Amino acid sequence: MSRIHDALKRAEQERATSMGTHVEPSFDQPELRNPELRNEVSTELPRETMPSMSSTSAATMPAMGSGLTYESLLTRCPQTEWTPDPRTMLFFGEDETRVGAEEFRTLRTRLYQIREKMPLKRLLVTSALPKEGKSFVAANLAQVLVRQHGRRALVIDADLRNPGMHRHFGAPQTPGLADYLLGECDEFAAIQRGPMENLFFLPAGRVVASAPELLSNGRLKLFLQRVEALFDWIILDTSPVIPVSDATLVANSCDGILMVVRSNATPSDLARRAREEFPDKLLLGVVLNGTSSAALARSKYYYGAAVSTQV
């Protein structure tokens, strides 16, 4: 039995034993259960080169800015005023010792360990059902990644049906990915930079009814090829897997997938069904979210098994 299967089974068992029991966290908590991963890994990795776009017809491209470099992003992308939600954003305030923050550092360490074995830059974060905390996990993961000196991250709200990432950041929703995929703006207009150094945000943009058509028209893949050399990590938050097919479309352009499972809530059969939508080689593991803050706070050295990886 795979370790991912074990993680899903444990989540179902916790759900069964706690029905009717109040869980007290004031905000979502990821529980990272892997005791041997306490030490940080900060291995320097070479930046990947941007693929050549010379063979791509200009007619297939959306509106694009010319001369795309990191320096051009700094000078031409709007620096917007963000008002991050203090209930869910763990790394924007002065106190970075809040319950849950260390679990994200552990997740960062695990991702770098996986990255030593396989190419890993474009990371998709999804869940089986709505309200499991995928956007919370994606937003805080992006923040903790840029906490390492010199690391750059772009977080993308690719949930075009029900965008919510902008609310975590307290950032404008438009223009964004949908507007870019429709050819109505270029990267410089759509990508935002806020107060946190090296962290960039591409919101979903306006809500559209044609999300599958936009996500599969090839423009998202071209966009990722165009910007990937500028960032160490690209985190994509997508629609949940069970209700719609959007996540499986976005997965075709990603290197790895994290599945968010909500403790005491996600039925194991639906979690397994969601897991089966993706190739084994892409699914990195499961993040168990929504665990009790009291349980984590009882021991500052407690680490559980929320990330179960196949690599």
Q: Where are these predicted regions, by residue range?
A:
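P-loop NTP-binding module
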Residues: 1-311
